[in-house]
Design a protein with these regions (language model features):
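Single conserved hydrophobic/aromatic residue that forms the stacking wall/gate
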Residues: 1-8
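An alpha-beta-alpha
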Residues: 41-92, 182-202
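Flexible loop/hinge segments that line or gate small-molecule binding clefts
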Residues: 11-35, 144-152
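Hydrophobic alpha-helical segments within soluble ligand-binding/sensing domains
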Residues: 33-55, 158-178
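Segments of small-molecule ligand-sensing domains
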Residues: 176-263
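Extracellular/periplasmic periplasmic-binding protein-like sensory domains
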Residues: 134-204
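Short beta->alpha junction loops
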Residues: 91-102
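Periplasmic-binding protein-like
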Residues: 5, 20, 114-125, 140-142
Length: 263
């Protein structure tokens, strides 16, 4: 459908097409849009780090390190955790599927059996949250406010606000300012964020999140800043610089030093 849409858009100059999470565009009336979800992942890592007692945090991941979107999210989460709890470890269990309820259940159970007391996720079902609640520990949801699924466990959820892009895109067509460029918004555009924190978060969590959010919004914190050590002992990045967008979206195939993949 994606390829056909791009092909069919070419001769229809008065209709505008936008594809979420895509990569193809014609620079005219077919564009793609995505967002800096890693910014919200970083904030959620702060929440997780502030609330762990075992210093073991789990992460159910849809894809392995070959997928930069998933891996970048894990690393951003880990960097957020590290900023408040450098001794904590993040254990990742990969399902190799964007949607597999059974695999997501099994992955969450593996992490809970390892005494992870906060379980985050980049997968579609709410099972990591509901299973965390059943065990009496915490979770970090994704895509929607999962506190409705696990009100006693979900510390917060990482969410998208796609309406921010849709409003801007439609307005640009109305105004005649549509320029055919791709879109990559973030917290400054209100495209990504985290939900309100649970009232059972430990003292100081909100303050830590607020400070980090201010730094991200101001540009002081780019999340992937400076020299970053991977879990294989190598380093990426340069002192005084932030990884560029091309690297963030397509070149993060490594894990931060506090991350361990569970086989």
């Amino acid at each position: 459908i994606y390829t056909l849409s791009l092909h069919d858009a070419l001769p229809i100059s008065d209709i505008y097409f936008a594809h979420g999470t895509g990569y193809k565009s014609n620079g005219k009336n077919f564009v793609n849009y995505f967002g800096r979800i890693y910014q919200a992942r970083y904030l959620s890592g702060i929440v997780a780090g502030m609330n762990t007692k075992t210093n073991k945090l789990g992460y159910v991941a849809a894809m392995d390190s070959s997928n930069s979107e998933v891996t970048g999210g894990i690393d951003a989460f880990a960097l957020g955790v590290y900023s408040v709890k450098p001794e904590a470890k993040i254990y990742v269990k990969v399902t190799n599927s964007w949607f597999d309820p059974d695999a997501e259940k099994a992955a969450a159970q593996t992490l809970l059996n390892m005494d992870c007391d906060v379980v985050a996720q980049h997968c579609d079902t709410e099972y990591p949250q509901t299973m965390a609640q059943e065990k009496g520990v915490y979770g970090i949801g994704y895509n929607s406010d999962m506190s409705k699924n696990a009100p006693d466990a979900c510390l917060c959820s990482v969410i998208w606000n796609w309406g921010a892009y849709y409003t801007a895109a439609v307005q640009s067509v109305i105004d005649g300012t549509w320029d055919g460029s791709n879109y990559y918004g973030g917290m400054n555009e209100n495209l990504v964020g985290i939900t309100s924190l649970a009232d059972f978060c430990t003292d100081g969590t909100q303050e830590a999140v607020d400070t980090a959010k201010e730094d991200i919004l101001s540009g002081k914190n780019g999340v992937f800043d400076g020299v970053i050590e991977t879990n294989t002992g190598e380093t990426v990045g340069e002192e005084g610089k932030t990884l560029d967008d091309a690297t963030i979206t397509g070149g993060i195939n490594w894990y931060f030093k506090t991350v361990e993949v569970v086989e």
